[in-house]
Amino acid sequence: MSDEQTRPDRFKDRKVPVPVPAYLPSAGSPLAVDKDVYSSIQQAPRVLVNEFTLPIRSGRAWEAPAGSIVRITTPEGPQVGDLNVWNLHNPSERFWASRTRQLHASHLSTYDRLWSTLPYLRPLVTILSDSLSSYGKDINGGRVHDLLGTRCDPYVNSVLSSGAQYDFHCHSNLVRAVMPWGLQERDVHDVLNIFQVTGLDKEGRYFMSPCPAEKGDSLEFLAETDVLMALSTCPGGDLSLWGFGADSEAEMIKVCRPLHVQVYQLEDKDFLANQGWKPSEPAPYRGMHGMKVPEGENNPRTASR
């Protein structure tokens, strides 16, 4: 590189325009839900159809049919959870954290949607309510319900902790959780870290802050299609004692608490249809990425091969 390229003040006087979000929703865009409709769905009478408490440092999966409401709460106080979502009938369609981050924000809240991978690209679930929505941006730049990071896993733990072996990181908890549905480790994917506060420091480095949730805080989702969801109660608990090393798991268990999951159906089975709601559909792109597929060996386009 030239001296000019390495000059410390090279970009000192560069004028940078005020940035505009890359994906601003237009009228009728699927990025901008009808808040009146979704608010009415959240407030409509509902019937409990499934309920369980997820113990500390464990994982569990459950089904949520299209139109059902999933409520996740902190029954005993602050606790971080790592959430995965799949199309119930096709696990190759799963939550796409990075695209969701682009379409919405680095941290999610009410009316944001969890989008699926290509070639499907549709909302799997939409956040109906968030009791921590008022948290906003704290003095360190942290926000809640994180999409910047991903799940903790035994591989990075072994690398950073001199070969330490621990089997109950969120990745492992999710792997065990989905096995009864025929899914494997490769099906576990980047997560939505619910109730987790994160951000980037002045050097652009990822940080985590203690969970702000209190007893009874909640996050609710509307299933936009039939989904399989899986949740891990993070072994870091509320992250107030987060760390790596031989003693880290023994320390962090002191701040671990359960999470509670409830699945509801609306009492009025026609309510969603009357509101104009329909299950989400895959992206309408039907092209071939510029390719032409031959009809057979006698096709003129392939005769020279």
What is each PLM-predicted segment?
Residues 2-305:
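Acidic, Ser/Thr/Pro
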